[in-house]
UniProtKB/Swiss-Prot annotation:
Alphabetical list of Pfam families matching this protein: Ribosomal_S3_C
Subunit structure: Part of the 30S ribosomal subunit.
Protein name: Small ribosomal subunit protein uS3c
Single biological process term from Gene Ontology: translation
HAMAP family per the UniProt record, alphabetical: Ribosomal_uS3_B
Gene3D superfamilies given in the database record: 3.30.300.20, Ribosomal protein S3, C-terminal domain
Compartments, record wording: Plastid, Chloroplast
GO molecular function, one term: rRNA binding
Family of the protein in this entry: Belongs to the universal ribosomal protein uS3 family.
Keywords, sorted A to Z: Chloroplast, Plastid, Ribonucleoprotein, Ribosomal protein, RNA-binding, rRNA-binding
Record bears the keyword Chloroplast: yes
Length: 217
């Protein structure tokens, strides 16, 4: 039997890096880890609620969290930062206030920055959110995968693989379907591969979406 390993954890320190930067005492580690999870969930839900692009999804690439003695720095990488700024005249001030309330911090102890991703359709998380939004709207999964591969192909010179599992198109029996374009060398540690898993809640049940993006640098 094959043994599966997480593509990002497999490449940490080689072609991937951590998205949380901090050190903690043993007694504080669980607290900080739980806070990081809450921060990511709050940011993603806020952007999904307040920002809708033409494709009807928020587009968060990834979130980096840095902790210092008296400061928490949150860097949000999104494909469409202008949409978030245009949504509210105060920009992301409300999200900052929600984060301060969540963490119990003063304004000077929290810093939030919004950074645009140069190639948003090269980010697997943004693509996975797009696939999920299409499946929720009952778009056939094969058409969705083909369209997503075309979107990624415009900005990616390597390869992409998309896998969707569950009751596809409302079928009685769950199955797994996948599509690939280009090269996706999962066995090569030095390969610059980004990965994302994203669940999609549909009227037929939960569908699991996995996307691998290989950048040939």
């Amino acid at each position: 039997m094959g043994r599966k390993i997480h593509p990002l954890g497999f490449r940490l320190g080689v072609s991937q890096k951590h998205y949380s930067y901090w050190f903690a005492q043993k007694k504080d580690y669980p607290k900080f880890l739980e806070e990081d999870r809450k921060i990511r969930n709050l940011v993603e839900k806020y952007i999904q609620k307040h920002v809708k692009s033409v494709s009807n999804y928020g587009g968060v690439g990834h979130i980096e969290i840095q902790r210092k003695t008296d400061l928490i720095q949150i860097n949000i990488y999104t494909g469409f930062p202008d949409l978030l700024i245009e949504e509210q005249s105060l920009g992301i001030s409300q999200m900052k206030q929600d984060l301060r309330n969540l963490l119990g911090l003063e304004s000077q102890n929290l810093r939030v920055t919004l950074t645009g991703v140069i190639q948003p359709y090269g980010e697997p998380k943004i693509l996975a959110e797009h696939v999920a939004s299409q499946l929720k709207n009952r778009v056939p999964f094969r058409r969705t995968m083909k369209k997503t591969i075309e979107m990624a192909g415009r900005t990616n010179g390597g390869g992409i693989k998309i896998q969707i599992a569950g009751r596809l198109n409302g079928s009685e029996m769950a199955r797994v379907e996948w599509a690939r374009e280009g090269r996706v060398p999962l066995q090569t540690v030095e390969a610059n591969i980004s990965y994302c898993y994203h669940p999609a809640q549909t009227i037929y049940g939960v569908l699991g979406i996995k996307i691998w993006v290989f950048r040939d640098t």
